């Protein structure tokens, strides 16, 4: 009992920080400025002046470690007043790029670079412990034109020169990414009629619907209309009031006893009340101390009660790999920076400043956007079975309460078994335009844990093959 009181005391005295970026924290790796990293490539002036061929030629990446795969990279200006620029890296499909769908990947956070997706999850390359690249067998660019954007501004290589350039809500996120996408399709006009999909994971549960909704709205009057067909969200935080419900889940896993569950539920109820009162910052702080505690001097309640430092996969109490460190070290090499046209621009894999500006956004729901988008596009919501931070039952909580035209049918829809060849990959449920999938033996980052199945998952969705 004394220990329980002490935990509550520690919880209260450290109750003043944020629900921080959930990605593994890579070690600091400085850029050696004495080496020649070239200069940043800003493509917007060339695009605006109609110099498309020149822009594309300059954006080509030429480096011995990536020469086996065609790719393009550079900066797209999304706000001239604040000099806000977004970094992109684009990989044309290996098979039939003229007709292959264009897939945008957005990482979570808020403030995590999409280079995590590229190098740790679904891009054509993996950074080895020797800081060299090897090909990924199940890269999504096998049959997709694959686009990575560091989002929001201030994340990864993307940057702004004015504090007012940082996004503070999902409207800003949607606007900036849409501005970048329009320029991307001006740079690659042959792809404008290809099917387009917005995808992402984790806090991408906010970004993906925000960008999709922005495309829908801007397409009404836009000169360049984006051919959006669908959106896919992996382990996404979309509807916090109905998703942040960990006590029962951790109890069922055996990571909490009944007392721990009750303590979790006490604070979760307080958090939900704060959300309902639209006290976004207070709710943010509460749930951070419940789960993360990353930027405080005290462990989170989750850490105190379970002993876990990790919430991406309940089979691991600590991060089992150093892959994010290898990625950062590779990207900080001057020859690499010169090749990808970023020069000496600062690389921030997990931006605290982006998180600070987005803090009031975190606990707000975008379920209403998901409900609207189901009436216009196909929607895929998938979860890894072993995740904790955005676990499958928590996603199912919000989907069961989602107010959309297929809501009643969804509640009684039959679940199907999903095989990849002879392998049992997971389970799916489809009602009208909405598909929900559980991926077996995968944690928070599904393509990292189950790359073969993840490729099958996204390919079935983008090629409308069903499960």
Swiss-Prot record:
Q: Where is the active site?
A: 202, 387, 444
Which Pfam families does this entry report, sorted A to Z? Peptidase_S10
Give GO MF terms, alphabetically: serine-type carboxypeptidase activity
Residues linked to a glycan: 130, 169, 304, 322, 344
Q: Which spans are transmembrane here?
A: none
> Where in the body, by tissue, does this protein show up?
Expressed by the venom duct.
Which SUPFAM superfamilies does this chain map to? alpha/beta-Hydrolases (SSF53474)
Subcellular location per UniProt equals: Secreted
Known catalysed reaction(s)? Release of a C-terminal amino acid with broad specificity
Q: Which GO terms describe its cellular component?
A: extracellular region
Q: What is its EC number?
A: 3.4.16.5
Q: Which InterPro entries does this UniProt record tie to the protein? A: AB_hydrolase_fold, Peptidase_S10, Ser_caboxypep_his_AS, Ser_caboxypep_ser_AS
Q: Which UniProt keywords apply?
A: Allergen, Carboxypeptidase, Glycoprotein, Hydrolase, Protease, Secreted, Signal
The question of whether Hydrolase is a record keyword is answered with: yes
Protein family: Belongs to the peptidase S10 family.
Kindly provide the name given to this protein in its UniProt entry: Venom serine carboxypeptidase
- Which species is this record about? Apis mellifera
């Amino acid at each position: 009992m004394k220990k329980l009181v002490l935990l509550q005391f520690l919880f209260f005295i450290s109750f003043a920080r944020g629900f921080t970026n959930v990605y593994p924290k890579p070690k600091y790796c400085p850029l050696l400025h004495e080496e020649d990293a070239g200069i940043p490539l800003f493509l917007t002036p060339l695009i605006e002046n109609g110099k498309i061929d020149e822009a594309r030629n300059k954006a080509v990446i030429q480096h011995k470690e990536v020469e086996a795969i065609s790719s393009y990279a550079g900066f797209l200006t999304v706000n001239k007043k604040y000099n806000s620029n977004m970094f992109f890296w684009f990989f044309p499909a290996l098979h039939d790029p003229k007709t292959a769908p264009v897939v945008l990947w957005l990482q979570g956070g808020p403030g995590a670079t999409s280079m995590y997706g590229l190098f740790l999850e679904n891009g054509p390359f993996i950074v080895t412990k020797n800081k060299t690249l090897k090909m990924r067998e199940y890269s999504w660019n096998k049959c997709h034109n694959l686009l990575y954007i560091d989002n929001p501004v201030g994340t990864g290589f993307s940057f702004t020169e004015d504090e007012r350039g940082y996004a503070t809500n999902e409207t800003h996120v949607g606007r900036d990414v849409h501005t970048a996408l329009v320029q991307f399709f001006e740079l690659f006009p042959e792809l404008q009629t290809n099917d387009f999909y917005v995808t992402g994971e984790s806090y991408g549960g906010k970004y993906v619907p925000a960008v999709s909704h922005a495309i829908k709205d801007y397409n009404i009057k836009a000169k360049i209309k984006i051919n959006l067909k669908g959106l896919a969200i992996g382990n996404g935080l979309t509807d916090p009031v109905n998703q942040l419900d960990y006590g029962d889940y951790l109890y069922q896993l055996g990571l909490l006893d009944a007392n721990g569950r009750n303590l979790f539920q006490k604070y979760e109820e307080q958090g939900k009340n704060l959300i309902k009162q639209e006290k976004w910052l207070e709710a943010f702080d509460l749930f951070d101390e419940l789960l993360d505690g990353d930027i405080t001097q005290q462990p989170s309640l989750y850490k105190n009660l379970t002993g876990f430092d990790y919430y991406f996969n309940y089979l691991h109490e600590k991060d089992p790999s150093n892959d994010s460190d290898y990625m950062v070290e590779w990207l900080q090499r001057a020859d690499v920076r010169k090749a990808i046209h970023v020069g000496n621009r600062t690389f921030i894999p997990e931006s605290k400043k982006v998180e600070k500006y987005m803090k009031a956004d975190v606990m707000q729901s975008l379920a209403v956007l998901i409900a609207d988008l189901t009436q216009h596009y196909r929607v895929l919501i998938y979860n890894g079975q072993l995740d904790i931070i955005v676990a499958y039952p928590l996603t199912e909580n919000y989907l069961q309460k989602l107010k959309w035209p297929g809501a009643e049918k969804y509640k009684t829809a039959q679940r199907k078994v999903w095989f990849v060849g002879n392998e049992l990959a997971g389970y799916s449920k489809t009602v009208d335009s909405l598909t929900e999938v559980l991926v077996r033996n995968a944690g928070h980052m599904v393509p990292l844990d189950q790359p073969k199945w993840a490729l099958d998952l996204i390919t079935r969705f983008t090629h409308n093959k069903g499960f």
